[in-house]
């Protein structure tokens, strides 16, 4: 993985953690809104790295293709 992919995955992980925390007792404390705010702020700061890399290279788009599964003769792809 390169820096672009790992930074995006880290940002998405930071955004998903408040949803996962709702299954624990930390969700019921008064510090939970601050935790969510800090998590979103960290995800934003982390997402600046791939955005600046994208702008610096003067790319206009990114094409990604993911082969999900094959059912008999039909290929399911996500792009």
From Swiss-Prot:
Subcellular location field: Mitochondrion inner membrane
Biological-process GO terms, alphabetical: mitochondrial electron transport, NADH to ubiquinone; mitochondrial respiratory chain complex I assembly
Transmembrane residue ranges: 3-23, 43-63
GO molecular function: NADH dehydrogenase (ubiquinone) activity
Main location: mitochondrion
Domain of life: Eukaryota
Swiss-Prot/TrEMBL catalytic activity: a ubiquinone + NADH + 5 H(+)(in) = a ubiquinol + NAD(+) + 4 H(+)(out)
E.C. number(s) listed in UniProt: 7.1.1.2
Any GO CC annotation of this UniProt entry: mitochondrial inner membrane
tRNA-binding keyword on record: no
Topology with respect to the bilayer: Multi-pass membrane protein
UniProt entry keywords in alphabetical sequence: Electron transport, Membrane, Mitochondrion, Mitochondrion inner membrane, NAD, Respiratory chain, Translocase, Transmembrane, Transmembrane helix, Transport, Ubiquinone
Subunit-level organization: Core subunit of respiratory chain NADH dehydrogenase (Complex I) which is composed of 45 different subunits.
Entry's family note: Belongs to the complex I subunit 5 family.
Function in brief: Core subunit of the mitochondrial membrane respiratory chain NADH dehydrogenase (Complex I) which catalyzes electron transfer from NADH through the respiratory chain, using ubiquinone as an electron acceptor. Essential for the catalytic activity and assembly of complex I.
Name assigned to this protein: NADH-ubiquinone oxidoreductase chain 5
Species, as recorded: Carlito syrichta (Philippine tarsier)
């Amino acid at each position: 993985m390169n820096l672009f992919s790992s930074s995006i995955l880290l940002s998405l992980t930071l955004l998903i953690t408040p949803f996962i925390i709702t299954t624990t007792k930390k969700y019921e404390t008064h510090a939970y809104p601050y935790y969510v705010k800090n998590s979103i702020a960290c995800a934003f700061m982390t997402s600046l790295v791939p955005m600046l890399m994208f702008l610096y290279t003067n790319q206009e788009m990114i094409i990604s293709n993911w082969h999900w599964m094959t059912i008999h003769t039909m290929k399911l792809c996500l792009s």
